[in-house]
Amino acid sequence: MQPGGTAGPEEAPMREAEAGPPQVGLSRPTCSLPASSPGPALPPGCVSRPDSGLPTTSLDSAPAQLPAALVDPQLPEAKLPRPSSGLTVASPGSAPALRWHLQAPNGLRSVGSSRPSLGLPAASAGPKRPEVGLSRPSSGLPAAFAGPSRPQVGLELGLEEQQVSLSGPSSILSAASPGAKLPRVSLSRPSSSCLPLASFSPAQPSSWLSAAFPGPAFDFWRPLQAQNLPSSGPLQARPRPRPHSGLSTPS
């Protein structure tokens, strides 16, 4: 080397050896697979899609290659037993009705039934009831029966009072009386020992009515009798003999 001069031709190879290998700018190709693929390592230089001959072990395509029996096992429909009870599919409650129909005794189903028991119809909504042949109770009572026939008793009393042929409103009083029940002995025809009806005037109420039917129901007749009393004395019977009655007037 000469001082103060340029480097000679021997110094150029020494500088290249100290600097190292020449950098061309080419990097080594990376052939590593993605981290999500758990398959075997491929040889370097194969950066394209994996070969079709290798078994696919990716997680997204696993359910497609698994057998159908392991993914979702289903029973074949041909092995399902159908109930042989004559029931249609559209009838609600067919399974409980079939169970009850099979458990019911034969005597209970055929009591009073004229038609043979063919199972439930298609429009049935519940279990079959035994055909016992029940109907409406024939009690003989009318449809509008609501209680004891009290108006009939009043009508009978009114008819009997009309047969006795009482004068005045006594028959209406006996039919519409709100008091206690009248004794049936007093409703019969008066015998000869009683006073005849012809001995009293038809305008005045019968005096034996208050005596034969004592009670609070006939208390309102007493003021009427008091108004009919004459001012001279007490009430007296006015005899009016009838020619065709054949009854003698009292002395």
Curated annotation (Swiss-Prot):
Region (Disordered): 1-93, 107-152, 169-188, 224-251
Superkingdom field: Eukaryota
Biased composition (Polar residues): 225-234
PANTHER family xref list: DUF4705 DOMAIN-CONTAINING PROTEIN (PTHR37553:SF7)
Name of the protein in its database record: Putative uncharacterized protein FLJ44672
Organism (species): Homo sapiens
Source organism phylogeny: Eukaryota, Metazoa, Chordata, Craniata, Vertebrata
